[in-house]
Every structure is written in C-alpha cells, then in structure tokens.
C-alpha cells in the first residue's frame, strides 16, 4: 500500500522491508492514522558533532558585524514561529548606501536538518570578510556587488534538527507558485513571508537557495 505523498508535513525518506521511513509532523501522523496506517515514532537523531549551536552562529555574525563595519551589516528580516530572529548579513563596499550594482542573495537551511547549508553560508561570509583587501578577486566582488547571506532561514528547525518549521511545514514547499498562489502547503508560514517580503522589493537580484 502506498503512502499518500500530498499530505502536508510528510516527507517520505525511504521504504525498507515494507515499512516507510519518513519525517512527519504531528498533524501528518494523525492524518496517516486516520487513513489506517500504523505509525511508530523513533528517537530524534542528534545533530552530528562539530556543528555549532544557533546561539554560537548568531554570536559569530554579531562579532563579524563589529569587526568589519565598513563592508558588512547584520540585519533581521523577521522571526520564526518561536520568535527566533531570521538574520541576514549584507556584504558590500558601502553597506549603508544604496548603490546601483548587482545584488546577490544566498539563503541556507530552509530545511532545519540540512546542517551543511549554514556551514557553507557562514564560511562564505567569513571568507569574503577576511579576504577583502587581500585577495584582489574577492575585493573586486565585494566592491561591485551587494551580497546578502541568510545562513539559517528555519532557526526553529535547526535547533530541533528537523526538516520542518515549528508548525510542521516544509518551507521549501510553502512558497506560492503560478499554479498554487497560496503556496503548495498553505498557509504561508512566517519564515516564508519574511523571505518573500525581503525579496520582492529588490532589483537586479540573483538568488541561490
């Protein structure tokens, strides 16, 4: 028997010996149970060693903003369901001046358990800041581009080491599209709305998620 894949808050990972292994919200488990499926919870896998806690990541961002005020600015675009800040680091030669130059947006950790995303984003930020004025290619990039890096879009999911936000929604499937203007998994979540409100007014934008 196949598991319905269109249930909100359900992400099937694999199937072994007739059993489905999936990430599922409480609402998705209730819906599966109502459909006659037997569900069993397993302990949450702990975050792999070596990856920083959210507080440490935020502290690093604050430290860099203080160390490199001439080429970066830390700002907040919204909050998660649990009121955790959604932080963005802007890197450019004049962070307090609106200049006519290309804009680049880098969003990581839309899924809270994809930890390597924030790691790459944070290393990218650090490399740009510490190489500016030393590496001519990095200096040219920063001088001519308005770079915005969001290391963790889903802070609640990151803390819980969970794919979903605290409401049980997969944020990657929550954005509107031409065929689903209310989002593929409505309603729109605060993290999704924060990124949309942040992105829509921007011009000349290249994005990586």
Task: Kindly label every feature range from the protein language model.
Residues 1-57:
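Intrinsic-disorder/low-complexity accessory segments
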């Amino acid at each position: 028997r196949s598991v319905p894949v269109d249930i909100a808050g359900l992400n099937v990972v694999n199937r072994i010996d007739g059993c489905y292994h999936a990430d599922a919200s409480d609402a998705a488990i209730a819906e599966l149970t109502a459909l006659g499926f037997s569900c069993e919870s397993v302990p949450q896998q702990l975050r792999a060693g070596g990856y920083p806690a959210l507080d440490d990541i935020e502290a690093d961002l604050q430290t860099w903003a203080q160390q490199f005020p001439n080429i970066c600015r830390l700002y907040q675009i919204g909050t998660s369901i649990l009121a955790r800040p959604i932080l963005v680091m802007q890197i450019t030669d004049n962070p307090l001046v609106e200049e006519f130059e290309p804009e680049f947006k880098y969003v990581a950790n839309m899924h809270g358990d994809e930890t390597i995303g924030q790691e790459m984003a944070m290393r990218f930020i650090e490399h740009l800041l510490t190489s500016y004025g030393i590496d001519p290619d990095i200096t040219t990039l920063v001088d001519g581009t308005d770079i915005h890096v969001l290391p963790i879009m889903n802070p609640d999911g990151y803390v819980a080491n969970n794919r979903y936000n605290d409401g049980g929604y997969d944020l990657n499937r929550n954005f509107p599209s031409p065929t689903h203007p209310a989002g593929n998994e409505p309603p729109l979540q605060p993290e999704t709305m924060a990124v949309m409100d942040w992105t829509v007014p921007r011009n000349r934008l290249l994005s990586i998620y």
